[in-house]
């Protein structure tokens, strides 16, 4: 399995590049080999930045992930902590995480505390600098005249020490958060493999995906800001203490305002918590509904049910959006309160100080303002930390609850050497779900299948055959008794599980290649000829869920996997239903009775003609074994077994002979080879595999745009929420920055003017300008305006962001429903779901904050540089080279950042693809004991993703440190030029300039990082936009060309030179199909695998559009109608019955168009009224995801009921009875004959008895019509393809099929045709069953 999963197509190109040894692939990280200075300055990353500038970054260019960051190492650490935690009454996964990784985080907090302490040096130096200038102007200074230069050096040095501490602290924090994220993803994956059935039924895949994407991501986000949150309160307290030292009691006025805001913050935080809990729940429901649609998209398109299912998802989304509006408003209140606090506090503090002192001291005032500015960061982070802390707490609780769900108990392994290999069940009573009283199960089962035996399990629909299989595998909960297995198990499920890999890898399934055994397996599983027809042979990639194979091919691959595993015990759940009768015969005799003859084989089967060959037969009814024994013992009992034979319409005397058996083996093989040569005499005409590419890949590599995020992506986001609303909010962003800057400038102007007034008074001159009281009033007015503008900006902007989020989801979802079918064939579901989870969550919760923060910081930086340059003009001299260096640093960094962001996103999708695949095949994974191999695959993909993320974070630190250096240089030069110009510059302007210059250190770096972060977040919009644009199906409705309401009236169909290919550039799969089907005709369609049977259905429903030619219904070209108008007037019963979670009523009538009477009448027609009445709620009873609370046979009957309710004029049966037993098959066929007698019916069949009463049979070969006539007429051609197919079913059955064809010709009711009697005895054969006991 490990080999299979690691060789995905999206990784193949990267492996090629790895061979070229570009970059650091396969090497240790340069960080691990760096010296102290290189590590301190992140200089070890210089070479990597240059590499990213020169090359398009690939995953293979990255160095190996450090061993201490690998998920395997982290898993061991968390496992110990979690073991301790689960012993507690209220375990917490977050506590376990802190216990495992907390020590490292303490180091991060220590480093950040040093940085915080150093921040307070700046305001202190600022005050001293202002005093130095004032005293120099007055000539009263006792300090060294060069003291200003010393202050500049102290400011620069301490700021750089703070920067070093900050970035190394952040590096540790992000690493800790990523470790927690990784380990949550891994532990959730491990748990998903082990979930019990009761836990699985209550947990949807969508919920689990949300845990792995959104909830795990919260850890990274929280720990990225953990230090800011942990030290916010100490930082605020120290600021206030230093503020008190500067200005005295007015500090308490500001403190009082902050204390008054606490209750409001608390209320908003509480509301945020409550709203977030509901939001997560609604998100789970939406993702679950979306995932279900994607899993069954083909059926939804065939039924034209897009509107019904879209309504469900949009309803979920609208409920989510309502809460998102509430969440946004509470968050905005929190942001407004905290962001406005420093401005409001400054107004109160300055006003109080002036009121008390009746004058303004520049050194005190501007030091105070610097302290108040330092408060902005911890206060600004508080709402974010509170919101993220709430989300982390909820996420941690959800993860904890999930990890505490009950697990599947391993089946007892018997190691008694005296016992033969096999399955042992003693007095076993089992159930699917202990918590539900009405849960189906098995009662008091005593069963043994041991040694070299073949045991067949039979029973009617819903009797418990598959339930027995699941009990043997340990998938059911044991209420009483014992179940044990001796030996290894191989399992073939009823619906084949195929992994997204090559055909060969699907068969080998992680085991070492034994070429001889492999070739033998291909032979006995009848796969050799199929492989020859694939252009890439067994290296063809068969796609997610095996979309590149027919149902029969998928099942044969599944059987081949089991056979190749060379297990001791084989448990096969109805594997022959999906294959043609002649292939089934080959599999039974060559495989089950051939290569597996030395094994224990348990075969659930609906093909009763094989019963004489079984060593034992078990008969099930209502979850109990009612009969057991050899075939001959059972037919003499005249009990349930005889009843089943009678319902199937098989004479027990006939089946006891050589019915459905091969002719002489050599002769049979010659016949098969001869017909295959005839069928494929023109090799070039054979249809290639669906969607095959020249390199054998099927799944498309995930798109990765190169270069910067395009402007159209930003424009997409801007216009999504309403361009006018965005424009208004941008105006408020400008006004907010302008009002705050102007407010601070006015304070400087006021202090300067106040000093000049004092000088005028002292000189006896008339003072000019505004009075101090007037200046105070203007200052207060400007401050209040800034607060008001901030409130308006936040409310408008965050309202806009929710509108944008709503519009983007709707557009994405609607575009997805309109995608052509080949898009879903090429695109793994996990990748699509990633758009609806991680990417959409980013748009819902992260992009708005990221853009807002970036715009605020960018405008502040611009305002700062302009203001400082006006006050200190000489600063423009060093500012020019500094700006150039800044530009180049940012330019180089963006190449690195973009490459890493995109690879991180691309390496994330395979994690979810693999998870989705695992959930679909979890029973097979457990049966084959492949859990650990899949966990290793998950770890490898996690490590690839983590490597990208941690490298990106290192690059952020690399840039941040260098930008801080530049910002500190600006402050340094500002001090230098102020010292030079100390005799002419205003002290108030010194305070203003240095105060703003000090803020550059943090703001410049944060602005640059936020620019990169915003681009990262916009990648979510970019990836969603990729799905919004691109190929779409034809319109659902064409207003100018709609069919009449009663169309089609007759149901005639005409194919006129129809040519169809799956995609442009591929060979056609239908080649010039021309025929007419009369109204009400019953047409059977047969042909070998790849002949084009299912392609005709795809063309009729326009799932694939015709390349040439046309199809007409009642004389109307179907290409001119909308898809909805076409598909709603057709009906199909597909091979794989699909039910959706909801109610039985919704599954039958999703648009609520039928009356209660119609529904119950239809239920009676399919003979399920007793079952429905026994369900709690009847028609409104719950249907679980995938309809797992119904058997496959019952699901197919419900699908038949859907078709009955449609009352179509044209019905298509696409191998509709392939997966049901004989009784259900007979019921379905009888219902179709009776209820659809006035319909045109096209039947694609594996069981020839279902089509021998057709009016005509169409035999397809290599995409062309080989034969098309009445069954009896075709059977007169001894060299015909239909004749061969009939003969291949075995002599006895061939005679019966000919009688059916003759009866149809003579107008005799086929129900009157009894199976042939024992007068006709075919010649002896090596495969003749043993005679009955005498």
From Swiss-Prot:
Chain segments annotated as transmembrane: 106-126, 147-167, 222-242, 247-267, 333-353, 370-390, 718-738, 776-796, 843-863, 865-885, 958-978, 984-1004
Gene3D superfamilies listed in its UniProt record: ABC transporter type 1, transmembrane domain, P-loop containing nucleotide triphosphate hydrolases
GO cellular component: membrane
Compartment annotation: Membrane
Residue numbers binding ATP: 459-466, 1087-1094
InterPro entries to which the protein is assigned, alphabetical: AAA+_ATPase (IPR003593), ABC1_TM_dom (IPR011527), ABC1_TM_sf (IPR036640), ABC_transporter-like_ATP-bd (IPR003439), ABC_transporter-like_CS (IPR017871), ABC_transporter_C-like (IPR050173), ABCC_6TM_D1 (IPR044746), P-loop_NTPase (IPR027417)
Stated name of the protein: ABC transporter C family member 10
Native source organism of the sequence: Dictyostelium discoideum
Taxon lineage: Eukaryota, Amoebozoa, Evosea, Eumycetozoa, Dictyostelia
């Amino acid at each position: 399995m490990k080999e299979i999963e690691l060789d995905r197509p999206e990784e193949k190109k990267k492996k090629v590049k790895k061979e070229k040894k570009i970059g650091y692939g396969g090497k240790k990280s340069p960080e691990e080999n760096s010296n102290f200075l290189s590590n301190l300055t992140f200089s070890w990353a210089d070479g990597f930045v240059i590499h990213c500038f020169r090359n398009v970054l690939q995953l293979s260019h990255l160095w190996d992930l450090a061993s201490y960051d690998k998920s395997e190492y982290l898993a061991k650490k968390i496992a110990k902590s979690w073991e301790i935690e689960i012993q507690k009454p209220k375990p917490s996964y977050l506590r376990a995480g802190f216990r495992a990784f907390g020590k490292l985080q303490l180091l991060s907090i220590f480093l950040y505390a040093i940085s915080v302490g150093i921040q307070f040096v700046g305001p202190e130096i600022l005050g001293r600098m202002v005093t130095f200038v004032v005293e120099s102007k007055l000539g009263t200074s006792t300090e060294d005249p060069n003291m200003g230069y010393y202050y500049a050096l102290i400011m620069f040095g301490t700021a750089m020490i703070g920067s070093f501490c900050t970035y190394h602290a952040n590096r540790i924090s992000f690493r800790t958060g990523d470790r927690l994220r990784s380990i949550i993803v891994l532990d959730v994956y491990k748990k998903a493999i082990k979930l019990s059935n009761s836990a699985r039924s209550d947990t949807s895949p969508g919920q689990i995906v949300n845990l792995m994407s959104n909830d795990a991501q919260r850890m990274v986000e929280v720990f990225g800001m953990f230090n800011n949150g942990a030290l916010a309160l100490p930082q605020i307290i120290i600021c206030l203490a230093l503020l008190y030292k500067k200005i005295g009691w007015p500090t308490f006025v500001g403190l009082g305002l902050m204390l008054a805001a606490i209750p409001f913050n608390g209320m908003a935080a509480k509301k945020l918590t409550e709203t977030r809990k509901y939001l997560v729940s609604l998100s789970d429901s939406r993702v679950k509904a979306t995932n279900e649609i994607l899993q069954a998209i083909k059926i939804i398109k065939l039924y034209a049910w897009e509107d019904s299912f879209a309504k469900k998802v949009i309803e979920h989304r609208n409920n989510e959006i309502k809460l998102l509006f509430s969440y946004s408003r509470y968050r905005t209140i929190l942001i407004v309160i905290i962001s406005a606090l420093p401005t409001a506090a400054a107004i109160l503090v300055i006003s109080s100080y002036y009121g008390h002192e009746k004058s303004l001291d520049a050194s005190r005032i501007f030091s105070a303002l610097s302290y108040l500015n330092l408060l902005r960061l911890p206060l600004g982070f508080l709402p974010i930390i509170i919101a993220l802390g709430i989300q982390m707490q909820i996420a941690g609780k959800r993860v904890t609850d999930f990890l505490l769900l009950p697990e599947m108990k391993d089946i007892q392994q018997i190691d008694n050497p005296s016992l033969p290999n096999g399955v042992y069940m003693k007095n076993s009573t089992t159930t699917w779900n202990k918590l539900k009283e009405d849960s189906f199960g098995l009662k008091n089962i005593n069963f043994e299948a041991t040694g070299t035996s073949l045991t067949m399990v039979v029973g009617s629909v819903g009797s418990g055959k598959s339930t027995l299989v699941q009990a043997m595998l340990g998938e059911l909960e044991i209420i009483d008794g014992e179940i044990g297995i001796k030996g290894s198990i191989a399992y073939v499920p009823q619906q084949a599980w195929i992994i997204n890999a090559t055909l060969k890898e699907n068969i080998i399934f992680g085991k070492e290649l034994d070429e001889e055994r492999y070739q033998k397996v291909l032979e006995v599983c009848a796969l050799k000829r199929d492989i020859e027809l694939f252009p890439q042979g067994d290296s063809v990639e068969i796609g997610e869920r095996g979309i590149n194979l027919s149902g029969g091919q998928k099942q044969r691959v599944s059987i081949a996997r089991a056979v190749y595993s060379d297990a001791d015990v084989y448990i096969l759940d109805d594997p022959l239903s999906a294959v043609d009768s002649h292939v089934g015969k080959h599999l039974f005799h060559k495989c089950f009775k051939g290569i597996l003859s030395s094994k224990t084989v348990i075969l659930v089967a609906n093909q009763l003609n094989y019963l004489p060959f079984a060593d034992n037969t078990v008969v099930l009814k209502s979850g109990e074994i009612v009969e057991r024994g050899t075939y001959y013992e059972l037919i003499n009992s005249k009990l349930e077994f005889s009843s089943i034979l009678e319902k199937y319409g098989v004479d027990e005397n006939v089946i006891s002979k050589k019915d459905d058996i091969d002719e002489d083996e050599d002769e049979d093989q010659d016949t098969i080879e001869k017909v295959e040569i005839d069928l494929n005499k023109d090799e070039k005409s054979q249809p290639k595999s669906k969607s095959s590419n020249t390199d054998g890949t099927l799944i498309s590599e995930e798109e990765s745009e190169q270069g910067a995020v395009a402007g159209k992506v930003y424009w997409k986001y801007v216009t999504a929420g309403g361009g006018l609303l965005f424009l208004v909010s941008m105006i408020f962003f400008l006004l907010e920055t302008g009002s705050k800057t102007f407010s601070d400038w006015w304070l400087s102007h006021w202090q300067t003017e106040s000093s000049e007034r004092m000088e005028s008074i002292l000189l006896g001159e008339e003072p000019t300008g505004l009075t101090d009281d007037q200046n105070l009033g203007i200052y207060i007015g400007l401050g209040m305006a800034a607060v008001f503008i901030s409130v308006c900006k936040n409310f408008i902007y965050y309202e806009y962001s929710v509108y944008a989020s709503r519009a983007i989801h709707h557009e994405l979802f609607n575009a997805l429903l309109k995608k052509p079918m080949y898009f879903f064939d090429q695109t793994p579901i996990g990748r699509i779901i990633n758009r609806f989870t991680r990417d959409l969550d980013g748009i819902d919760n992260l992009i708005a904050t990221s853009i807002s923060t970036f715009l605020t910081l960018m405008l502040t930086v611009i305002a700062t540089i302009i203001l400082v340059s006006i006050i200190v003009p000489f600063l423009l001299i060093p500012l020019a080279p500094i700006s150039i260096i800044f530009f180049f640093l940012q330019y180089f960094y963006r190449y690195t950042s973009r490459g890493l962001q995109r690879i991180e996103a691309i390496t994330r999708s395979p994690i979810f693809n693999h998870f989705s695949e695992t959930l679909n095949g979890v029973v097979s994974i457990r049966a084959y004991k492949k859990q650990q191999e899949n966990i290793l695959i998950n770890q490898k993909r996690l490590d690839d993703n983590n490597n990208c993320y941690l490298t990106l974070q290192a690059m952020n630190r690399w840039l941040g440190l260098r930008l801080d250096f530049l910002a500190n240089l600006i402050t340094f030069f500002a001090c230098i030029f102020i010292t030079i110009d100390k005799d002419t510059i205003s002290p108030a302007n010194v305070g203003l300039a240095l105060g703003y210059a000090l803020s550059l250190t943090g703001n410049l770096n944060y602005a640059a990082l936020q620019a990169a972060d915003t681009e990262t977040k916009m990648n979510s919009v970019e990836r969603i936009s990729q799905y919004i644009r691109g190929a779409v199906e034809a319109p659902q409705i064409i207003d100018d060309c709609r069919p009449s309401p009663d169309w089609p009236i007759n149901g005639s169909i005409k194919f006129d030179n129809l040519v169809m290919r799956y995609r442009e550039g591929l060979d056609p799969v239908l080649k010039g199909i021309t025929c007419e089907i009369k109204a009400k005709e019953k047409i059977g369609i047969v042909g070998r695998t790849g002949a084009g049977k299912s392609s005709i259905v795809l063309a009729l429903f326009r799932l694939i559009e015709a390349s040439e030619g046309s199809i007409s219904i009642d004389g109307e070209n179907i290409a001119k109608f909308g898809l909805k108008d076409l598909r709603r007037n057709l009906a199909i019963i597909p091979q794989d019955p699909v039910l959706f979670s909801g109610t039985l009523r919704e599954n039958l009538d999703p648009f609520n168009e039928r009356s209660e009477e119609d529904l119950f009448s239809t239920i009676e027609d399919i003979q399920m009224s007793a079952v429905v009445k026994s369900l709690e709620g009847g028609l409104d009873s719950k249907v679980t995801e995938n309809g797992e609370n119904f058997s496959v046979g019952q699901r197919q009957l419900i699908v038949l009921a859907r078709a009955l309710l449609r009352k179509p004029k044209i019905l298509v049966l696409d191998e509709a009875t392939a997966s049901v037993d004989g009784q259900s098959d007979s019921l379905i066929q009888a219902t179709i004959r009776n209820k659809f007698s006035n319909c045109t019916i096209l039947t694609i069949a594996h069981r020839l008895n279902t089509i021998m009463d057709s009016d005509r049979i169409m035999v397809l070969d290599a995409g062309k019509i080989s034969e098309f006539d009445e069954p009896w007429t075709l059977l007169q051609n001894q060299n015909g393809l239909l004749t061969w197919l009939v003969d291949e079913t075995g002599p006895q059955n061939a005679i019966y099929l000919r009688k059916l064809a003759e009866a149809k010709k003579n107008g005799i009711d086929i129900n009157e045709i009894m199976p042939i009697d024992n007068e006709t005895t075919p010649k002896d054969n090596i495969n003749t069953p043993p005679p009955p006991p005498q």
